[in-house]
Each structure stands twice: as structure tokens, then as C-alpha cells.
Amino acid sequence: MSVTSSPHRSGSVAVIGRPNVGKSTLTNALVGAKVSIVSNRPQTTRHRLLGIATFPEGQLVLVDTPGLHREQKRAMNRVMNRAARGSLEGVDAAVLVIEAGRWDEEDTLAFRVLSDAEVPVVLVVNKVDRLKDKTALLPFLAQVSEGRTFAAVHPVSALKRKGLEALVGDLLKLVPEAEAMFGEDEITDRSQRFLAGELVREQLMRQLGEELPYATTVEIERFAEDGALLRIGAVIWVEREGQKAIVIGKGGTRLKEIGGKARLQMERLFGAKVFLETWVRVREGWSDDEAALKAFGYE
């Protein structure tokens, strides 16, 4: 991607929004690599992570976050909201991602959180390619912008990589003149071990869809290099025996499909052959247990 911005700039940008507006898809598109998992299921992103987007003119350290939502019943929901709010600490700017043609209470919540942070906010109106009536876009932008201040407004399609060049140009203007914080080849601050767990979780959501129990997480129990081979052991945690049966599937076919597709994604991302083993285990009530959440890596 070619952008015009001089001199060299570098800074951090929080990517904020309600669930399922395409924050992770946008982060991946700007980075140029898959650092955040994506699915059609809301609240796919559960952890805060950095995506590092490097251009000739500068570097943007994108803080991808869980979607801000009103659900607070489980400890896991509260932890995810804390992670999203905490991502604003020390950033130079923020991106508010919304869906073209839609603004609801959770979008308002996200905007209020950003208003309290006192950083410049760029509004990114994503999924414009899905808007059936294109003439409705400008009135929608005017409606959303009324009474709200944005440093810039960008309609984009993160999935189709449309409108991103102008967005990058404006974001680089909002970060300070500085040397890059990360090397050119670095794309995330997260370890391969963490990414392996996320790729298994992504396949859980893709393969099970609406059948997937909400209280499902993945723990990487083993991650070891064996010559040119990566040996990875992944535990899928659920809360009840019935949920375990759903994940495993008849004769283990569903678990095999999940593991096979996750392994291919790992090999593509890590550039190495992967031997992946997966198990499903039960831990009752883990999603509402602060100690269990901490043990599973939730911030």
C-alpha cells in the first residue's frame, strides 16, 4: 500500500467498536497479515493484541480490542470490556469502527468511551460494499457525524481492502514524528503459542457456528520445536459434558475437522510443518471465575 506522509511517523492507534463490526478484519488488512482471528460470530476477539503495520512513511501500532458490549453477567464479559477500555491508555489516536447503515446503543457506548479518552478519533464506516442502497451512505454519514467530532471519516471495505490508503494517510498524520517502535518484519506482539490457540478457537467458531457454546476457550498445553516440525498440543475447555460432545462430534469427526483446518492455518502463518493434537476437557463455571480466566490468559 502506498501512502504519502512525511517525515517518518510512528505511534499507537486503538481500534474500538461494538462486536462484529470488522475491527479484526480491518487490523489484518492494514497489517497485511493475519494477526487477529475473524468469524461471523460476535465477540470473536477476546484479547487485546497489537498489529504492527509498517509503511515507508511510518509505522502504526494497531491495538485490536474485544468489542465493547453491554452484557456484564459473566466475569469474561467484564474482562473483555476492561481490555477494550484499557487499550486507550497511552495511545496517540483511536479508530471507531461502525457498520455502514447501522448505529445502535453499543456504538453510542463505544463513542462515549472514546470521548472520555481525549484522543483524536477517526470514524471508519466499514462494510460499505454490503450497503444495498449506495445513495444512503452520505445521509448516514451526516447523521452519525451530527453532534460528534471526528478527526476524519472514512468509508471502507476492510474485507475487500477498499478505502484503506486514504485511511492510513490520515492516521499517520495523527501520530508523532518518531522512529519505528518495531522492526519491519514484526507484525504482532503476541507469541506463536498465543496465535496457535487463537487459530484453534477461530476454527471452533467457523465449524460449529451457532452450536458453539459461548463458554469455550483454548489453552495451548504444549508448543515445542522438533527440528523443522512444530509440535503443538491444544486443550479446548468447555463447561459441561454435553458441550464436550458437541465439540467432538460423532465419532470425533468434528474435532478432527477443527484440528485439521487449524493446523493448515498455523503452517501458513508460521511457515513450518505442524503436528497438532487437540483434546476437549470440562471445567465447570470457568467463564465466570476470575482466577480461571487469569489462568487461561484473559487480561
UniProtKB/Swiss-Prot annotation:
Tagged with keyword Cell membrane: yes
InterPro entries for this protein: G_ERA_dom, GTP-bd, GTPase_Era-like, KH_dom-like_a/b, KH_dom_type_2, KH_sf_prok-type, P-loop_NTPase, Small_GTP-bd
Membrane topology: Peripheral membrane protein
Single GO biological process annotation from the record: ribosomal small subunit assembly
Record region (G5): 156-158
Ranges where the record places region G4: 126-129
Residue intervals of the Era-type G domain: 9-177
Classification via CDD domains: Era, KH-II_Era
Annotated region (G2), positions in chain: 43-47
Binding, GTP: 17-24, 64-68, 126-129
Main location: cytoplasm
Descriptive protein name: GTPase Era
Protein species of origin: Xanthomonas oryzae pv. oryzae (strain KACC10331 / KXO85)
